[in-house]
Amino acid sequence: MTQAQMEDIMREFNAELEAERGKKHGEIERAYTMKVEAINSQLSAEIAGLEIERDKAQEEMMCAKIAMINADTDERKTAMQVNFERVRFEQEKKCRHIRARIDELKRVAKVDILKATNERDSLNRQLAGQLTEKYNAKVRSLKDEEVRL
């Protein structure tokens, strides 16, 4: 086998390896993208639900404040003031819990995305190792054949 023939074989083999790398890399990237999109979609849905709860809590505080302002007698104003303070305390507490839950959801999503990124990077490293091994095996087989000839 001539040097030119060996170079032709290696060029063809490199093209095959590059096509395989491109295909598998594309699969890895698509799987990663789907995971990240699913994480972000779930996060958005959960946050939207929590924001609705928060808005309801704020609306309840506003209703109590309006009732206090619109009270017609001093006695009723005092009662509405007490009610408003109670409602405000409860709803502010609820809002703090909601904010904390949103922060926790974001943290968990960030960790999940980091795990997906690490998994993707690991799969890409494995792919590179497999392709390198195939390349090295082909080079060895060509050298062995060259020695036999």
Where are the model-predicted features located?
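The feature captures the hydrophobic core positions of alpha-helical coiled-coils
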Residues: T2, M6-I9, F13, L17-R21, ...
